[in-house]
């Protein structure tokens, strides 16, 4: 049913706003509510004045599973630049939803990236997606635990965009008075630098 608010009783809520106006001359807004898994998805086609839930916690068929118990860790949503009725949702993998009917809004989901495939596959995107940004040429950049992936055809094909940098995500860091530093990293173990390696920038796993 339509209402004026997206329920706030969720550990995490991600919002997205369309870059263009829809056929009613309003911006479309989307909200994805999660705990460890999907709670609900909501849409507004009138600049946020009213909202309609189009997916509940039970979700679509059982093969649909975006978050796989990680909904508070990885969740992101974006509206495609040229279609206010189509969104991409990032969790473990990237999924697409497109509205196909109105009153109430309803549509279908399609998985458009696959973490389980070989990294050489054009459908491969690393797991745990955290950020999505479009550029002026409608290329989508997705930031995840493996770095950055990009698509220039709305998810039909994906390419790695990791060039010339070494990064990791730290959850905790400690250091001593002499400048030695240790950190616990996502998927990269515990890294330590006591300035005894060939450069001061080098860390070793301990």
Each predicted region: which residue ranges?
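Beta-propeller blade termini and top-face loops
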Residues: 1-206
């Amino acid at each position: 049913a339509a209402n004026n608010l997206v329920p706030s009783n969720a550990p995490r809520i991600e919002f997205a706003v369309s870059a263009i106006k829809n056929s009613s001359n309003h911006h479309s807004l989307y909200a994805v509510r999660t705990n460890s898994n999907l709670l609900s998805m909501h849409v507004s086609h009138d600049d946020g004045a009213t909202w309609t839930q189009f997916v509940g916690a039970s979700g679509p068929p059982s093969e649909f599973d975006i978050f796989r118990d990680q909904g508070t860790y990885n969740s992101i949503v974006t509206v495609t630049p040229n279609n206010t009725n189509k969104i991409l949702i990032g969790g473990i993998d990237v999924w697409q939803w497109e509205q196909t009917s109105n009153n109430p809004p309803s549509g279908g989901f399609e998985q458009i990236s696959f973490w389980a495939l070989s990294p050489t596959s054009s459908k491969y995107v690393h797991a745990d997606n955290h950020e999505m940004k479009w550029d002026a040429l409608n290329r989508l950049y997705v930031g995840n635990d493996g770095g950055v992936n990009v698509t220039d055809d709305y998810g039909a094909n994906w390419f790695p965009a990791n060039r010339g940098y070494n990064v990791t995500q730290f959850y905790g860091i400690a250091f001593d008075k002499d400048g030695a530093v240790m950190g616990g990293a996502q998927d990269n173990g515990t890294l330590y630098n006591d300035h005894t390696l060939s450069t001061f920038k080098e860390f070793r796993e301990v």
